Amino acid sequence: MRVTGITPQDLKAYGINDIQEVVYNPDYDTLYREELDPSLEGYERGVLTDLGAVAVDTGIFTGRSPKDKYIVRDDTTRDTLWWSDNGKGKNDNKPLTPETWQHLKGLVTQQLSGKRLFIIDAFCGANPDSRLSVRFITEVAWQAHFVKNMFIRPSDDELEGFEPDFIVMNGAKCTNPDWQAQGLNSENFVAFNLTERMQLIGGTWYGGEMKKGMFSIMNYLLPLKGIASMHCSANVGEKGDVAVFFGLSGTGKTTLSTDPKRRLIGDDEHGWDDDGVFNFEGGCYAKTIRLSEEAEPDIYHAIRRDALLENVTVRDDGSIDFDDASKTENTRVSYPIYHIDNIVKPVSKAGHATKVIFLTADAFGVLPPVSRLTASQTQYHFLSGFTAKLAGTERGVTEPTPTFSACFGAAFLMLHPTQYSEVLVKRMQAAGAQAYLVNTGWNGTGKRISIKDTRAIIDAILNGSLDDAETFTLPLFNLAIPTSLPGVDERILDPRNTYASPEQWQEKAQQLAQLFISNFEKYTDTPAGAALVSAGPQR
C-alpha cells in the first residue's frame, strides 16, 4: 500500500478502512491519465475532446438534487438553522436525525473502504482568517479533478500543515436501501453534519453537489460573524471599483462578470468583510449550452487541457456539439480561474463593492432590462430573489418557470433570509453602494434580451452613465428606468414598448405583481419585513 501525505490512521478516524492506495493531491497530469484510463467503466471514464479538455457524464443527475438534501438537527443547529418544517419560508433544509446520519455515514464509509482513493485538500475562501480547510475523499478521479478546479489550491507549504476543518466524503456509487423506512425522499442523499463538520454524498454523480455543499456551509458560518455570504459573481475595474452580480444559475453571473475591461474576482460565490469582497473558490463553473467562441470568447478559450466538461455531446472525432441539449440544458465546464486571463492576482479579492447588480431572467417579459433601486427596493428585491428557474439547473425542470429564491440563492441558505439581507445592507451602506435590477430574460417579443444589449447596460452601470441618465417610473412596480443609454435600443428600455399594446403588458404585469405580493407575505410577520411591502409592486 502506497500512501503519500495522509496515513491509514487519518482515514480510520473517518471510518474508512483497508484502503488499497491513496492518491493524495494529484497534479493535473496525473488526473488526466487517471480519468482517461481505458479500463474504467460507466460514469468514471472520461472522453478526450478536440479542445484538450476531458468530458464526463453524470448520468441522470445532471443538476443538484435539492429534495435529497438533509442537515442533522442537533444542539448545534436546532436554534440557528432555517428549517424546512419551521416558519413560513419554503426551503430545502430538511432535518435528519443523528441516528439516520450514522446509517448514511456507514454506507459511504463502507463504499470507500478497501478502495483506491483520491484525496484533495483545498481551501474554501480566499481570506485566511475566514476560510475553510476542506478535505475531499472520493474513489472517482474526475471528481477529484472537479474539486481541484473549483476550490483554492494550497501551496506545498500550506499542505504540510493542513488540518481539515471540514470533510466531504463522496460515495456516488452507494445508495440508501432503507430510505423509505427512514422517511427520506429517495435512495440518494446529500447530507450535512455541522457538529461533525462533514458532508456525505450518495447516489448522485453530479459534481456541483460538492461545490454547493461547501457554499452552504460558508452561508452558515460567515453571516454569524457579520460577514456577507453571497451567491454572486464579482469583478473590479482599473480604478479599483468593485461590482457584484447576484443571480441564480443561468441568469448571466459568469458571462457578465467575465469582461475584457475588468478583472474577474470570481464567478459565483463571494464574501464581503471589513477588507472588501473575496472569492470562495479557485475556479469557475460555466454553463456551456449553445456556447460560441464569438459570443463568449473568454469562456470558450478556457476550455482546454485541465478543464472538465460535464454532459456535453462529444462527436466521434472529439469535437463538441455545444448546441445539443439532449442530455441536459445544464451542460457545464469547470476550470481553474487562471484559465481566464483577466483575473485579480495573486489572491481573488478586492476592495468594497460600489455597484450591486441583481440579475433576473423574467419569464413573463414584464420587468425592464434595467432599473435603479432605492434602498428599500434593494432589500425587497434581494429578499424576493425573483427569476425564472432556467431549464436544467435542477432535475425535472425543462421549461422556464417563474420562481422566487430568497437572496438569489435560497437553495444554499442555512440561516433565515433576513439575516443575509441585514448583513448585505450594512456592507452596502458602509461602502455607499448602489443597487440595480437587470433583466437578462425575455420581453414582449418572446425573445430573450440580447447579450449585446445587456453588456451595454452593465457598462452604463459601471461607468456611472446610468446614474446620470434621466429616468421615468414604471407603473405598478414603481421602478426607475432610464430614458436612454449608450449602445442600447431605446425602445426596449420600457418593456411596454415590446408588446402589441400597453394593455397586454398591464395584464401580465398585474399577474406578476400578484406573485411578488403573495411571495413576500412570508416576511410580513416581522416589523422590518412589513415595512418593506411598500417597496414592492402594488395591487
UniProtKB/Swiss-Prot annotation:
GO cellular component, one term: cytosol
Residues annotated as binding substrate: 64, 206, 212, 332
Cofactor note: Binds 1 Mn(2+) ion per subunit.
GO biological process assignments: gluconeogenesis
Annotated source species: Cronobacter sakazakii (strain ATCC BAA-894) (Enterobacter sakazakii)
Ligand binding (Mn(2+)): 212, 231, 268
Function: Involved in the gluconeogenesis. Catalyzes the conversion of oxaloacetate (OAA) to phosphoenolpyruvate (PEP) through direct phosphoryl transfer between the nucleoside triphosphate and OAA.
Pfam families documented for this protein: PEPCK_ATP
Gene3D superfamilies: 3.90.228.20, Phosphoenolpyruvate Carboxykinase, domain 1, Phosphoenolpyruvate Carboxykinase, domain 2
Lineage: Bacteria, Pseudomonadati, Pseudomonadota, Gammaproteobacteria, Enterobacterales
Pathway it works in: Carbohydrate biosynthesis; gluconeogenesis
Keywords: ATP-binding, Cytoplasm, Decarboxylase, Gluconeogenesis, Lyase, Manganese, Metal-binding, Nucleotide-binding
Reaction(s) the record says it catalyses: oxaloacetate + ATP = phosphoenolpyruvate + ADP + CO2
InterPro entries associated with the record: PEP_carboxykinase_ATP, PEP_carboxykinase_C, PEP_carboxykinase_N, PEPCK_ATP_CS
MF-aspect GO terms: ATP binding; metal ion binding; phosphoenolpyruvate carboxykinase (ATP) activity
Protein known as: Phosphoenolpyruvate carboxykinase (ATP)
Compartmental location: Cytoplasm
Gene coding for it: pckA
Broad enzyme group: lyase
Cofactor field: Mn(2+)
Family: Belongs to the phosphoenolpyruvate carboxykinase (ATP) family.
Key word Nucleotide-binding present: yes
PROSITE patterns in the cross-refs: PEPCK_ATP
Annotated residues for binding of ATP: 212, 231, 247-255, 296, 332, 448-449, 454
